[in-house]
Amino acid sequence: MNRTLLALLAIAVILSACGKTENTTPAASAPVAANVADLAAKAQVKAAAASLPQADAATPASSYVDITSGHQLMYSYLALSGVPPDYAAVAQRISREYAGSNDAFRKQEVLDALKPQIDAKVNEAKTKRYLRYQINGQGALSPYAMDKAAFPAKFADAGTYYYMYDNGDYKLAFTNCDGYSLLKVDQEAARKIEAARSGYKDFAIVVYAYAQEADLASNQVKAQIVKVAIKLNGEEIPVNQAR
């Protein structure tokens, strides 16, 4: 009986050891699987962005339209969406008379008068897809990184979008965010920008972008960043390199 008991104990030890090995293997591979999934997701996002209409980098600055109102983003969104405008919803945004009236007949008269104007704005947005948008530099740039000779930038982080207070229903987001996490300018300009940043002075990041598509799920105009400049004391300082 002692020999039988010893044999059973030996088998139990072997099985226990095998079980521990099998349990630890998946735990060790879990981070690897997560990393692979993350890389695959990023590759998919890049591929999707590459499949969209692309900007012509040679387009002159004079062809870019300054975005100063959320109504512009609304018209751009409608132009890119291919969906007929909801005239009543647009009128509610752009006309105080329409929004403030309780008279059904008067509202209809105002709406009928606005429809041609709305159509004209949407058609104009179809032909003007190059956009220029200014972002407050304070908070968008981190302190100058000496080891990288560049400003770490947060204005184009994945998931970031922008909207205007006069019409916050429509937003602007960028499709090639990963290429603009570090902004390089010449050394003299970097000193001036860092002095403004650290001294809480006003400066702006000027984004030149190309409207590519409308995201119907989020009311966003998706745009490709073409180039970036930093505006300080009324002068645009071109970003020499971004990555």
List where the protein language model places each region.
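Detector for methionine-enriched segments
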Residues: 1, 27-28, 74, 146, ...
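Sec-dependent bacterial lipoprotein signal peptides
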Residues: 1-16
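Residue-level marker of positions within ordered structural domains that often coincide
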Residues: 8, 23, 112
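Long, low-complexity intrinsically disordered regulatory regions
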Residues: 16, 26-27
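Bacterial signal peptide processing site
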Residues: 18-22
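Extracellular/mature segments of secreted proteins
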Residues: 25-26, 185
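N-terminal Sec/ER secretory leader and immediately downstream segment
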Residues: 28-127
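Mature extracytoplasmic/lumenal regions of exported proteins
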Residues: 124-243
